[in-house]
Amino acid sequence: MISNRNNNTSIHNATVENVEGKYKSIGDISTEMLNPVIIDKTVWTIFNNLNIDVQYPLELECYLNIVEKSYNIIYENKFSINWLPTMGTACFRAILGDKNVTITCNILQAIIISLFNDTNNLSASSVYNKTGIQYDLSEKILESLFEANIVTRKYSSNDTVYIVNTHNYTGDTNINIINEFIELFETPVNSSNSSVNLSMDKKSDDSKIQETDISTAETDVKFLGDEDYVDGNEDCISDNEDAKKYDSDTDSDLGDLEDPNEPKLIVDSCSDCSESDSEEY
């Protein structure tokens, strides 16, 4: 089995250099938020997993990149990680109206919440075009945000548009919206356009709605991934004293993973969202 607890400690202590590139706009990156659970798929079969090829928003993609590079260093490129977005959790700090709200959600919900950093309104078709998440599933995720009072909705002739609820949010300051999605997942969504053309243009017909952005702070993220062997069937090791710097052309560089005294780029994280090391399976 993969030694998640030891590896997560290495990730937490890693030095991340946010070099010039597509991740530069993210600013400070905190690896202490990351608690990935990596499972060897040869010993744990996951049933009923949706086969979704998700395009992650930039910040989530960056953190996945950090985890993958960490495992490449520790296991010397022995494994290939396949992320399962239906089985992870995240914690956001967001500003809704005059309230600072802590939102605990699953990764699919986190993907859409992250999109609201760039626009104040989304529809299922625009989510599909941005992320590749199927229309019906996108509608259910957006509906779960509506049920949690995070967004309002507006019906149009083409699609239902969901708008950040920055004026009339009356909910709690600490909410867990995972159950809203679970309850909606097996139920049909009452959509005004269930047969939308998924190849439609990415621009929403409601793009003229007055903008009011949702502001999210750092996220506390736990992803679930499974690993494929690249070659060989040797047992996994918990650490690698001779781990070398992984040199690649990607935009985030990791320093020495083994030295806990290395300086880290850490921003204020959500204290209510902090989690202990992932359980070792």
Curated annotation (Swiss-Prot):
The Acidic residues compositionally biased stretches are: 227-240, 249-260
Segments of this protein annotated with the region Disordered = 192-212, 227-281
GO BP terms: ubiquitin-dependent protein catabolic process
Task: Determine the domain of life of the protein's source.
Answer: Viruses
The signal peptide here is: none
Tell me which stretches of the chain form a coiled coil. none
Q: Name one GO molecular function term.
A: ubiquitin protein ligase binding
Disulfide bridge partners, by residue number? none
Q: Where is the composition biased (Basic and acidic residues)?
A: 200-211
SUPFAM superfamilies under this entry?
Cullin homology domain
- Family listed: Belongs to the cullin family.
Question: By what name is this protein known?
Answer: Uncharacterized cullin-like protein R337
